[in-house]
């Protein structure tokens, strides 16, 4: 029985060997046929290369068991002495991307007439006392009117708000030039045409006031503010009754009303994110994503479904500093955006990021790039001082500083809201009109404080950085840091509250002796001289060594 089994096994093995021999013979025959074909091609066309076979591109290997594909428009199959060209249906055709047409900015514009604005808008500017555009306005207005998505970067107080409001008002609303608008009057009244998002209530209210000034008392209802701290029901009723063309608000309140179905923004043509570097923080992320999904659609983006009734929106990002996070957001949310600065307009694709996207820890180049943009955000006509004081004497130092510089409008910064009331109480006890502003104040209280501060009824406004972000008080001539900012970027945001629109401004940092090294570190990072000063006999006195630096 064992012998019979062995015999059968040998017979099967012999048959299998014969089968393998036949397979190898067929493969060899096929190989020699192809070799003869290649030799024939070589004799007729010279040397045998990939180019001679119309395969000029390099081969690319795929996974095991898959045929080798060539990165070209056609794949050549050889066999049976014939050549057949087969088109690769899965091959993607990459179109050459045309560079965005950049409008030459009018840096030498001496009047708003040169920017091509409607006559009605020019009359409003003249009525409000605006005669000469700033550098950033001369650069931004033509670019936005041309239809470019834009990132506007300029130092604090350079007129960035008007830089985007003017082109928007020239396209929509009662001041728009009729020949530019492609929408009927009924569409304008039923759909929101522009949305402006700000990180704080103060900045949102400030933008609304600027729009109302330009629109005038007759058309002021064409803009509606949607900010937190106010009655939501009244805001929804105002939306339904007034049918505004422009909405200005904070991310949370806008997203809240949008979820309730009371905010119709599919026909929105303009989306502005002011102080976008702050809006990119984690606590705004969910609301910002909802706004981006419901406010029009990105220009150049295809429809998500079979029918997409959303209008193409023009996206404008605004900030005094443009770190890599802003550049990344602009490329994701916009279509071929341009970077608008006070002296140039360039495609954002040409701006080199300072660090890779996935960098979890800031590198030296990333930190240097952020510091560089911070320096650019500072108003040019600022003087920076620091003085040493014990913690319990800081309020007296603040009072002596105000008297020595004869300051009329002062903003004093602290890091925590709970300490503001104590500082205000001590200043009031010493006969200096002051008030506090923080997040716990309601909308009415904050509006009242800001109005009194701008009118001069309040000399010192004590606040924290978040509440004062975007605060625009052109008359502010002194900023005092009663507590040190966390870094150079926060210092720049505080310092930007003074020296606005080319005015002179002073920044004084009050620190303890153990904190001087922090001031020196910020001085080195910003590349600006921080002069040590003292207040003697009602005057600000600078040491002889620092006087040499001034000269």
Swiss-Prot record:
PROSITE patterns: HELICASE_ATP_BIND_1, HELICASE_CTER, Q_MOTIF
Chief location bin: mitochondrion
Reaction catalysed by this enzyme: ATP + H2O = ADP + phosphate + H(+)
Motif annotated as Q motif, chain positions: 110-138
Catalytic activity, EC: 3.6.4.13
SMART domains listed in its UniProt record: DEXDc (SM00487), HELICc (SM00490)
Intervals of motif DEAD box: 274-277
InterPro entries: DEAD/DEAH_box_helicase_dom, DEAD_box_RNA_helicases, Helicase_ATP-bd, Helicase_C-like, P-loop_NTPase, RNA_helicase_DEAD_Q_motif
Record: residues binding ATP: 154-161
Stretches assigned to the Helicase C-terminal domain: 397-548
Domain of life: Eukaryota
GO molecular function: ATP binding; ATP hydrolysis activity; mRNA binding; RNA helicase activity
Primary enzyme class: hydrolase
Chain ranges of the Helicase ATP-binding domain: 141-340
GO biological process, one term: plasmodesma organization
Keywords per UniProt: ATP-binding, Helicase, Hydrolase, Mitochondrion, Nucleotide-binding, RNA-binding, Transit peptide
Keyword Nuclease: no
GO terms for cellular component: mitochondrion
UniProt transit peptide range: 1-29
Mutant lacking the gene: phenotype: Embryogenesis mostly arrested at globular stage and cotyledon stage. Altered size exclusion limit of PD; abnormally maintained dilated PD at the torpedo stage and increased formation of secondary branched PD. Chlorosis. Altered plastid development.
Record's subcellular location: Mitochondrion
Expression (tissue specificity): Mostly expressed in leaves and flowers, and, to a lower extent, in roots, seedlings and siliques, especially in meristematic regions.
Domain notes: The Q motif is unique to and characteristic of the DEAD box family of RNA helicases and controls ATP binding and hydrolysis.
Membership in a protein family: Belongs to the DEAD box helicase family.
Function: Essential protein required during embryogenesis. Required for mitochondrial metabolism. Necessary for normal plasmodesmata (PD) development and aperture regulation.
Protein name (database record): DEAD-box ATP-dependent RNA helicase 47, mitochondrial
């Amino acid at each position: 029985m064992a012998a019979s089994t062995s015999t059968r096994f040998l017979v099967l093995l012999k048959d299998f060997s014969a089968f393998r021999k036949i397979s190898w013979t067929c493969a060899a025959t096929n190989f020699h046929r192809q070799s003869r074909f290649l030799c024939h091609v070589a004799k007729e066309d010279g040397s045998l290369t990939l180019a001679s076979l119309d395969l000029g591109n390099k081969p690319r290997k795929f996974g095991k068991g898959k045929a080798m594909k060539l990165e070209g428009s056609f794949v050549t199959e050889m066999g049976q002495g014939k050549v057949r060209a087969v088109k690769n249906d899965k091959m993607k055709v990459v179109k050459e991307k045309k560079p965005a047409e950049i409008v030459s900015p009018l840096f030498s514009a001496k009047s708003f007439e040169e920017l091509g604005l409607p006559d009605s808008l020019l009359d409003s500017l003249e009525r409000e006392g605006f005669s000469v555009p700033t550098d950033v306005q001369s650069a931004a207005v033509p670019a936005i009117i041309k239809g470019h998505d834009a990132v506007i970067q300029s130092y604090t107080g350079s007129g960035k708000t008007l830089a985007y409001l003017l082109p928007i008002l020239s396209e929509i609303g009662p001041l728009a030039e009729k020949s530019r608008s492609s929408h009927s009057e009924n569409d304008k009244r039923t759909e929101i045409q522009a949305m402006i998002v700000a990180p704080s209530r103060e900045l949102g209210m400030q933008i609304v006031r600027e729009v109302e000034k330009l629109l005038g008392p007759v058309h002021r209802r064409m803009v509606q503010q949607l900010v937190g701290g106010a009655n939501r029901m009244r805001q929804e009723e105002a939306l339904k009754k007034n049918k505004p063309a422009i909405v200005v608000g904070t991310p949370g309140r806008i997203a809240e009303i949008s979820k309730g179905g009371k905010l119709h923004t599919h026909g929105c043509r303009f989306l502005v994110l002011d102080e976008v570097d702050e809006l990119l923080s984690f606590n705004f992320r969910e609301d910002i994503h909802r706004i981006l999904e419901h406010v029009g659609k990105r220009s150049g983006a295809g429809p998500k479904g079979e029918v997409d009734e959303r209008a193409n929106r023009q996206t404008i990002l605004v900030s005094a500093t443009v770190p890599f996070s802003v550049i990344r957001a602009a490329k994701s949310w916009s279509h071929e955006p341009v970077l608008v600065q006070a002296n140039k307009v360039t495609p954002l694709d040409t701006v080199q990021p300072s660090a890779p996207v996935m960098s979890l820890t800031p590198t030296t180049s990333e930190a240097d790039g952020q510091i560089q943009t911070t320096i650019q955000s500072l108003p040019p006509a600022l003087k920076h001082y620091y003085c040493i004081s014990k913690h319990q004497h800081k309020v007296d130092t603040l009072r002596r500083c105000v008297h020595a510089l004869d300051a009329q409008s002062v903003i004093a910064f602290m890091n925590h809201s709970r300490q503001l009331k104590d500082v205000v109480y001590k200043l009031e006890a010493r006969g200096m009109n002051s008030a506090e502003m923080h997040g716990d104040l309601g909308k009415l209280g904050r509006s009242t404080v800001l109005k009194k501060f701008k009118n001069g009824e309040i000399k010192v406004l004590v606040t924290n950085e978040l509440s004062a972000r975007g605060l625009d008080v052109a008359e502010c001539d002194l900023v005092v840091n009663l507590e040190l900012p966390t870094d150079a970027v926060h210092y720049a945001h505080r310092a930007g509250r003074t020296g606005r629109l080319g005015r002179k401004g002073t920044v004084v940092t009050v620190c303890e002796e153990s904190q001087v090294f922090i001031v020196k570190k910020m001085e080195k990072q910003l590349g600006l001289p921080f002069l040590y000063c003292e207040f003697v006999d009602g005057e600000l006195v600078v040491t002889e060594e620092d006087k040499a630096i001034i000269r």
